[in-house]
Amino acid sequence: MTTNLTFKLTAAAALTFCSLALQAEETVQTSEVTVTAGRVEQQLLEVPMAVTVVTNQEIQESAARNVGELLEDIPGVMVNNAGSQGLKRVSIRGEDTFRTLTLIDGQKISEQKSMSGASILIDPSSIERIEVIKGPASVLYGSDALGGVVNIITKKGSKKPFEAEGSVAWNGAGHGWAETISLGGTYKGLNYHLDAGYQSHGNIKTPLGYQKGTDFRQKNASAFLSYDFNEHFTAGLRADTFDSDINSSSWEYEQDPNSEFFVRIPKWKRDKVALFAEGKNLNEYLTRLRWDGYWQKNHKNMRNYVSQPNGRMKVVTDSLADNRIKTYGTSLQADWQLGESNFLITGYEFVQDQLEADTLAKTTMAPMLNTVTNRYVKGKETTNAIFASMETSLPQDFTLNYGVRYTWVDSKLSKAVGVKNGYAPGTKYNNAPDDKVGQVGSDKNSRPVFNLSLNWTGLPDTS
């Protein structure tokens, strides 16, 4: 045992030394990292917000199986796994997960059914980098960004005419395998990238043993294609799909022989098609004009099962959900250089989420005491927004940033049907209306948000 311990300590010290040596040789200068957190390409130190970047090199060197595991070591970021290896949501600076805006290439992953926040439905093998904005960014990104923003930038070609890579990885936490393959390149103005991956992981290993019902699988594929018509104009498209099968459980219930809890998500799938066109340096003032449009579908099937003792009875709640969200979005952004000291970003955004959700809930308290509730809702939320953000350079290394965003939201619940059948203590239900399904109707509201900040960059390599 002593020899074993000595060997481990020696090996750990050697690995630490090697790691430090490699870090010293491969240090990435922060000033060289380019980000788009401010909706325009900037050096990281020039961004007037608290931004952390997970680079492509860090992603490649990581053993992370999903985006949540890539973000869990960032200060100020907390990853909520909801009892599962494969289901991750992000909280920033203590805010709830639904106050974190999750974007893929600047476009929102919508979650309209729960208040748990959007799950990050993309594989790390498709990602070029991740930009995390810590703190409110409502003028540039809307009110969903009250806690912060996770913007995932996908891979888009390479500098060489052709590159290909593949990987096979094994993870001991769940005895799982992950395989990925990708190829891409640039040739005479044509930029392309293709990738695909598959992961399968068993129940997670913990100090208490293997936790049952925590296995997951996921698969993904994406394709990107763009063409540079000249030095000023580029257009392209991207299509991707991500599908997962996720299970979740709880040690608290597993250790109680009279209770049972599990969540099964046999299907959580995201499909997306996006188009863009961009012009750069169009005249003396207009430095960039970009249009984006996209369609996205988010489909989740879920079963939530809870069994608990209640006196001499056992209460069982078994719920099934089928949620479909279709999202249509478009945006137009113009960047202006107004003299040497003023840079203005203006834009318009449109997003419409269309939700359809079916829920079947069964509650059993005894053989003759059970109820079945069916609910169906259909609705949509339409958001229009205009925004403007100015950066003004002042003397003595000061920069003034100020902006405004005005948002119009139109929410409509067009169908809300709920019926209940069965027996409860002293009551019989026969297609009885369910008063918890909600009421058909619509609501409109609009409001502005503002920002004002003064930044000083007088110290080198700080922001």
Where would I find each of the regions flagged by the language model?
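Transmembrane beta-barrel wall of Gram-negative outer-membrane proteins
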Residues: 170-200, 210-249, 265-280, 338-344, ...
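Extracytoplasmic beta-strand/coil segments of soluble accessory domains associated
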Residues: 68, 72-108, 128
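Flexible loop and strand-edge segments within Gram-negative outer membrane beta-barrel domains
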Residues: 207, 232-287, 297-324, 373, ...
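Non-catalytic regulatory/gating segments with a bias toward low-complexity or hydrophobic composition
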Residues: 51, 59, 71, 130-132, ...
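Short acidic/polar hinge/loop motifs at secondary-structure boundaries
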Residues: 107-134
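Solvent-exposed loop segments that connect transmembrane elements
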Residues: 249-263, 303-320, 358-375, 411-442
